[in-house]
A protein has these predicted regions:
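Short small-residue beta-strand/loop micro-motif enriched in glycine and branched aliphatics
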Residues: 26-30, 84-86, 110
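C-terminal domain-tail junction helix/linker
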Residues: 79-81, 106-160
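Short catalytic-loop micro-motif centered on adjacent basic/acidic residues
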Residues: 31, 58-62
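Active-site beta-loop-alpha junctions of metal-dependent nucleic acid enzymes
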Residues: 8, 12, 30-54
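An active-site-proximal beta-strand-loop segment
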Residues: 1-28, 34
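RNase H-like two-metal-ion nuclease catalytic core shared by retroviral integrases
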Residues: 61-63, 69-73, 83-105, 117-125, ...
Length: 160
């Protein structure tokens, strides 16, 4: 989980919260906002549909102010989720999300002109759907994240 920054056409800054499942490579959250606080992150996470209706064991994050909030800590504690903090100044500790953010920057944020926050969110949603449904990943055997999840669920069902 990480944050990115960009600007609307008029120069007004906004943030994008990104959350990706490292196992399936599925983009779970792309949420835009002018100001996203720790309380907002906890509320957004409450609404995330994690695969298999199960919460992750851990979420890897950096030491940004949004991630060291009491609200996020409480949310994670109540769900027995470990918040795994990367070392300050070491983006390589969370290389997967940094790589994902690079793709998001190159393919969505840098190629679009955002007229409003709603326009930015709509374009982020379209990019996320494309990423999850139509983009195969070599690390997933050239399946899309959605195909990989579907195959994983079918394998689990067939084992019982």
């Amino acid at each position: 989980m990480d944050f990115m920054s960009d600007a609307l056409f008029d120069g007004k800054k906004f943030r994008v919260l990104t959350l990706v499942d490292n196992y399936s490579r599925k983009s779970l959250v792309l949420h835009s906002g002018i100001s996203i606080k720790g309380e907002d992150v906890a509320e957004i996470l409450k609404n995330v549909t994690f695969e298999q209706q199960a919460y992750p064991k851990r979420i890897k994050i950096d030491n940004g102010p949004e991630f060291i909030s009491k609200a996020l800590d409480k949310w994670a504690y109540e769900r027995k989720i470990e918040l795994e903090f990367s070392r300050p100044g070491k983006p390589t500790d969370n290389a997967f999300i940094e790589s994902f953010n690079g793709s998001l920057r190159d393919e969505c944020l840098n190629v679009n002109w955002f007229l409003s926050l709603e326009d930015a969110q709509q374009k982020l949603d379209v990019w996320k759907e494309d990423y999850n449904s139509y983009r195969p990943h070599s690390s997933l055997g050239n399946l899309t994240p959605n195909e990989f999840i579907e195959n994983s669920q079918n394998m689990q069902i067939s084992l019982f």
